Amino acid sequence: MKTVTFEIFRYDPDKDKEPYYQTYQVELRRPGYLMLDALNQIKWELDPTLTYRRSCREGVCGSDGLNVNGVNMLSCMTKVEDLGTEHIVVQPLPGMNVMRDLVVDVDDFFAKFITVKPYLIRKSPNPDKEIYQSPEDRKKLDGLYECIACGCCSSSCPSYWADKKYLGPNAFLRAWRYLADSRDEGADERLPILNDKHGVWRCHTIYNCVEACPKELNPTEAIMNIRKMLLDTEI
């Protein structure tokens, strides 16, 4: 049975003056052993004080984003063996305040998400039946609606780290999901928000967000589409 060394970021603000790293030896007990399996093994068998988020175990809830060997990923979608190393460094998502160990404060992240009004806005009178959307228009939403708000994209972005008011790639992807929706009539409300100095123009097209997304979505493309809409629209 293969053993892998895990070096994990630890910090309890109630008792620690500074963060530190703690090392654990983890057994890979079956093929396809996940990062989440390894963290569970540590917590359940070695150190019950280790704190991290988890929920669905199926890449749906988005709660278990981590930084592993310098790359943001979901613990429930990452096989330990795929990392190709026997020494794994696990840290909280960068650019976010650490609450304890691997748990970060996501309040600001979701506040920025809400800022772009991530819901359908209708100005026309409600019709007597559902609002029709053609298959072609529905197809335009592929690659947009699948976001699970895990934070891997925004926390990989240098602009997000440097500018605490920058909305970030997650918010922009969500904004474009509705701007691209043929049923939505809220562009006049969203575009001024996105055109702000902390909006889409602060993106430097580094593409970290694209590399980090566990759902293989493209926030940078969404940002470019929003920029084009801004240039084509008088606001």
Predicted segments, located by residue:
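A generic structural motif
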Residues: 79-80
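Short, contiguous acidic and Ser/Thr-rich linear segments
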Residues: 22-33
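Ferredoxin-type iron-sulfur electron-transfer modules in oxidoreductases and energy-metabolism complexes
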Residues: 32-48, 91-235
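Eukaryote-biased recognition of intrinsically disordered, low-complexity regulatory segments
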Residues: 2-24
